[in-house]
């Protein structure tokens, strides 16, 4: 197994891993969503009068629909379908009436799920953390032998395509160089086991299969992946034991030893 993966596993199993990780991924619930008071009053009115069409027409335009239902997304993307599918409209509205008006009003202003906020957190942590290498914008990065690039996912992707023949059409999370040697990487915070999280793992691993030239690859991963005897640990880490997969918490140590 890769040295840095071993260090990450030890850190996760013996140290205050989660307390330290919170500095990288501070998953603090967002503020409640704001909805215009006039819209709230209309929702109350149509809920009480059980005006299915008007109530649904308002709710479907909000960021967050009050209930989970497989047919809602279709209605969101096809406004005409509302008039042609009265049975589904009635069924969904009956489900909404069952949760009560008070619950409905709470549901539509719920904060964004923290797992939807995770994306930018790693880069924010990079910006505010001191590393052994200087942090440079994309222009200054080319002028120096050493540095960590501060740029958007798309800027990093385009840079990697131009300089390393990087082929995937998705953004990158990390680019650095030391004494002229380049590193590119993906980051993931795997919060649980399951299909989506497995896909996230594979998404990060794909950086090693990107076909990029003249650079080395890293996958900066955190979360349940380091739980020994866990599903991800057994089926993925063992299969990818030769890759540089490690926690964000050991990134600076890795960069210090990178040659």
Identify the residue ranges that each predicted region occupies.
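Nuclease-adjacent, charged terminal/linker segments that flank catalytic cores
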Residues: 1-118
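Catalytic cores of nucleic-acid endonucleases
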Residues: 13, 28-29, 188-232
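A short acidic/basic microdomain associated with nuclease active sites
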Residues: 108, 112, 128-166
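Short, well-structured alpha-helical interface segments that form or flank functional binding sites
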Residues: 113, 117, 167-170, 195-206
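Internal, hydrophobic cores of structured domains that mediate oligomerization or house catalytic pockets
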Residues: 115-123, 127
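Secondary-structure boundary elements
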Residues: 125-134, 178-181, 214
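Active-site beta-strand-loop-beta-strand hairpin of nuclease catalytic cores
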Residues: 167-184
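Domain-level recognition of nuclease-like catalytic cores that cleave nucleotide substrates
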Residues: 219-259
